[in-house]
From Swiss-Prot:
Residues 57-234, 248-318 are annotated as: Disordered. GO terms for cellular component: cytoplasm; plasma membrane. The keyword Cytoplasm applies. This is Mucin-like protein 3. It is found in: Cell membrane; Cytoplasm. It comes from Rattus norvegicus. Residues 132-152, 194-203, 260-273 have a biased composition (Basic and acidic residues). The chain crosses the membrane at residues 402-422. It is a single-pass type I membrane protein. Residues 423-470 are cytoplasmic. Its main location: membrane.
């Protein structure tokens, strides 16, 4: 047992070490990535400095020989994580001469570019950090800007070299291939013939910003004459200028057209106002004739209204108040309709007189008709107004109240019938009980099991021989 326990302890410690090793490796890799993002130098930079001169020599030797570099010896034990640096040579695009016809097609500042190989893009995207990628993209933009600023000097620019480092953990049985990646990048970077499709795409992408800059230049050169612009501006910018001029002309025409519509609307409104004028003037004499007739009739109706009852007098002043409001509204509408025309000042007074007479006629007719009906009712009925009021009061009783009263009466009747039935049942039961009691009394008096005989037998007999009572 002691040997088993002594063997288990080292095994347990070994497993714990195996568990902690991946965690420590991940922590070290994270710290190196953070240092690489912030740009702070780490301890391993001082321990493993890379000389760019040696890498350049190795690259040139491998290029001339055309052979792969020898594999490095395999490490037999796990080592601490180190930063593996990949030297990448970014070859700037070379300026090439272009004919005048091609320059006219692409613009005054178009330049032939040598594309970056596709293999270099893939390898750099796999092995480089995002910060290094951003630096490379910034350099690419800087190179394109420098090409645009150049006035046509055809000179090959020197290739740029960059070092992108990343942390690498070396374990047992894994060879380190830093020089292989650098030589592959070098050898593949000088084969632009294999990526012809990519070169066309890059040329198209580089031609787009050139066109955009030319359009922006035309916007600044607009004050100049059109002849000078035709010599300096490309074909695309001429189209844009012509389109803008046409749009401005159309906008000015669209702004000038509403004036025609306004004139038409004004003329139409004047015609409408003129059309409204003659009917009013034609109807004025007939209205004057009707006013005299209405006034004559109104005097008769007012005399009849005074002889009516007190209710007639209370109803009569209520109606004219409502009609006065309507007359005010009619006057306001007439004033608004006749305001535009200056020739209708005389007709307004006639309208006011007509409306006053018409409203008086409309007011007096219903009043007199109601008074006449009330007089007929009072003369025909024996009870007079009191009987009419009583009928109105009786008719005002709601129907749902009648239904409720009927239901309550039915319920009371049912309760009364139930009480009668219960009383009869109780009386019958009591009668039966009285008859049974009367039948049992003679047997108790003259029977064999009477009270004194039972007592005598109980005294004479023993306790064991006593018979139970029936």
């Amino acid at each position: 047992m002691a040997q088993m326990t002594s063997g288990l302890y080292p095994m347990f410690g070994f497993f714990i070490c195996l568990l902690f090793l991946p965690a420590s490796w991940e922590a070290g890799a994270n710290t190196f990535q953070e240092l690489q993002k912030t740009g702070e130098p780490s301890i391993f930079d001082h321990l493993l400095p890379l000389t760019p001169g040696l890498t350049r020599r190795a690259l040139s030797d491998h290029k001339n020989s055309g052979q792969h570099p020898p594999d490095l010896p395999k490490s037999t034990a796990t080592q601490k994580p180190k930063r593996q640096c990949n030297t990448v040579r970014l070859v700037k695009p070379v300026h090439k001469p272009i004919d005048d016809a091609k320059a006219a097609d692409y613009g005054n500042t178009t330049v032939g570019h040598e594309p970056f190989p596709a293999s270099e893009k893939n390898l750099s995207s796999q092995g480089k950090h995002p910060m290094a990628r951003n630096e490379r993209s910034a350099d690419d933009h800087g190179s394109t800007n420098s090409e645009k600023r150049s006035d046509g000097g055809h000179s090959t620019s020197a290739p740029m070299r960059k070092i992108s480092c990343k942390p690498v953990t070396r374990t047992s049985g894994t060879p380190v291939s830093s020089t292989e990646t650098s030589t592959k990048l070098r050898t593949t970077s000088q084969k632009p013939e294999t990526s012809s499709h990519d070169s066309d795409l890059i040329r198209k992408s580089t031609s787009l910003p050139v066109k955009s800059t030319e359009v922006s230049r035309t916007s600044y050169r607009t004050p100049r004459s059109l002849g000078a612009e035709r010599h300096t501006i490309p074909f695309t910018s001429d189209k844009s200028i012509q389109l803008t001029i046409e749009h401005t002309k159309e906008a000015t025409r669209s702004q000038s057209t509403p004036t025609k519509y306004e004139r038409e609307t004004r003329s139409a409104s004047e015609r409408i106002s003129r059309a409204h004028v003659p009917p009013v003037e034609n109807h004025t004499p007939s209205a004057g004739e009707t006013t005299t007739q209405v006034s004559a009739k109104s005097t008769k109706h007012t005399e009849e209204a005074t002889t009516s009852t007190t209710e007639k007098a209370t109803k009569a002043p209520e109606r004219p108040t409502v009609n006065l409001n309507t007359t005010g509204l009619v006057k306001a509408m007439e004033n608004t309709s006749t305001a535009p025309s200056p020739h209708l000042h005389k007709t307004e007074t006639a309208h006011q007189g007509i409306t006053g007479s018409l409203t008086s006629r409309m007011d007096l007719r219903p009043i007199t008709s109601e008074a006449h009906h009330l007089q007929q009712n009072t003369h025909s009925l024996p009870g007079g107004l009191h009987s009419v009021q009583e009928r109105e009061g009786s008719n005002s009783f709601p129907a749902w109240a009648i239904v409720v009263v009927i239901l309550m009466a039915v319920i009371i009747l049912l309760i009364f019938l139930g009480l009668i039935f219960l009383v009869s049942c109780a009386s019958r039961a009591r009668h039966q009980l009285t008859q049974n009691s009367e039948d049992a009394e003679p047997e108790d008096k003259g029977g064999r099991n009477s009270y004194p005989v039972y007592l005598m037998e109980q005294q004479n007999l023993n306790l064991n021989q006593i018979s139970s009572p029936p």
